[in-house]
Amino acid sequence: MNSDDNRIASEHTLQGQLKLYYDLELPAAKPAPLLIALHGYGANKRQMMREAKQMAPENFALLSLQGFHQHMKEPKEPGGQWRFGFGWLTNFHPEDSVKIHHQALLDLIGSLTADGTVDRGRIFLLGFSQSCALNYRFAFWQPELLRGVIGICGGIPGDWETSADYKPTQAGVFHLTGTRDEFYSPERVADYEERLRLRAQNVEFKSYDAAHEIVPAMREDVRSWLTKHAA
């Protein structure tokens, strides 16, 4: 008889602590408008902070939160040093990662507004690629919290039409896409503007001559959009 016939297998979970890392840059004048910038898959907080500094007006506080799923990346050159990258979720219990993402944003916003560093009425959330749909989940789950949300070369939640978690918001929405994006092609994102308008009245959708990347024209338009909506 196979000994496995007498065994009972089951899956369990346990609670653990997770340390999240972020970079913060503050202007002299406070309380300041805040841009929270989240990177895409395989990147890190330093890379996204560089992007945020090129997109945000000078009077903005900048926060770059790093994804909590770490992985190794091959060296840039043969024989070189192995690198690290970070992501936000996988298809293994993604709801757990969504909760971590959401709670991290709530904690960061709560801390920075409580001490007067950030203007509670001028908080903006930006995501590139993988973090884009996660940010939309947060923005429409907390419809009164943000002044605006920006998505670059990313998607919208898969349960956008069916979930009761998403509420209408007065926050501005700016979605930027690349006409040569190999992951989010023009065909794939063709109905995004219409779908986002299901729960947001102030939606701007714009395409650029770009692949899966942030190009100078995008940076300029994001800066202008932030200036307008933070006024």
Name the predicted role of every residue range.
Residues 144-156:
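A conserved short beta-strand
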Residues 127-131, 135:
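Gly/Ala-rich beta-loop-alpha elbow adjacent to hydrolase catalytic centers
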Residues 39-41, 126-128, 178:
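Conserved alpha/beta-hydrolase "nucleophile elbow" surrounding the catalytic nucleophile
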Residues 117-127:
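Alpha/beta-hydrolase fold nucleophile elbow
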Residues 175-177, 181:
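Short beta-strand/loop motif that positions the catalytic acidic residue
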Residues 12-118:
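Serine-hydrolase catalytic machinery in alpha/beta-hydrolase-like enzymes
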Residues 50, 137-141:
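Active-site signature of alpha/beta-hydrolase-fold catalytic machinery across serine-
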Residues 174, 187-231:
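C-terminal catalytic histidine-bearing segment of alpha/beta-hydrolase fold enzymes
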